[in-house]
């Protein structure tokens, strides 16, 4: 079970009392057998980065046989949890809303104002919670966690203000790490270019 200090009402609450927790869409149920006008970006396992972000370039296109209801599409504030290792949770924002979420994931949609999605996103990605998820998942042959396990998590909530402080710092730190990775990638390209040019000049000088 998941425990968080709570200073408001006291007592434990299950995640399902604060949010809807359900599996994503079984794609075969709504998939068109022929080219369709109802095309949606699809969140697949390749999209999910270990740091808890979605790589949009990896998304597939899902062709549905009919317009999909909102319940099948990601919404800003949703938390998508990968059902298989490493059980990464991602927070949906404006850039990743409106995407089909497959049954490879659990969709958590917070419905109670006493729980901030950004805080729950941080919490689900902590080592302590990942370890509990892993312990549950390894008890079955597929090594996958299910929606019921997440729905039954017991929460003891922090105040909304404390949740906000933690989540803001987490998002700031995550953004800084992303920028540092981008900078490191650009430097690698720069160094490779300089070395390549130096090699070419050296060859011409022979």
Give the residues covered by each predicted segment:
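Basic, amphipathic alpha-helical recognition segments used for DNA target recognition
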Residues: 15-18, 106-156
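A structural connector/turn signal
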Residues: 68-69, 95, 140
């Amino acid at each position: 079970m998941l425990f968080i200090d709570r200073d408001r009402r006291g007592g434990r609450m299950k995640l399902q009392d604060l949010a809807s927790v359900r599996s994503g869409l079984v794609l075969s149920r709504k998939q068109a057998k022929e080219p369709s006008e109802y095309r949606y970006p699809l969140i697949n396992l390749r999209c999910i980065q270990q740091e808890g972000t979605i790589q949009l370039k990896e998304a597939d296109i899902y062709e549905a046989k009919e317009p999909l209801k909102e319940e099948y599409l990601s919404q800003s504030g949703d938390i998508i949890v990968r059902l298989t290792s490493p059980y990464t949770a991602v927070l949906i924002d404006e850039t990743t809303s409106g995407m089909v979420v497959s049954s490879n994931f659990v969709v958590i949609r917070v419905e109670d104002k006493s729980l901030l999605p950004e805080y729950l996103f941080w919490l689900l990605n902590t080592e302590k919670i990942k370890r509990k998820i892993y312990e549950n998942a390894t008890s079955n042959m597929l090594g996958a966690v299910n929606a019921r396990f997440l729905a039954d998590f017991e929460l003891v909530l922090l105040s909304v203000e404390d949740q906000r402080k933690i989540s803001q710092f987490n998002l700031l730190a995550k953004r800084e790490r992303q920028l540092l990775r981008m900078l490191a990638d650009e430097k690698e390209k720069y160094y490779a270019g300089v070395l390549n040019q130096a090699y070419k000049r050296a060859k011409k000088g022979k």
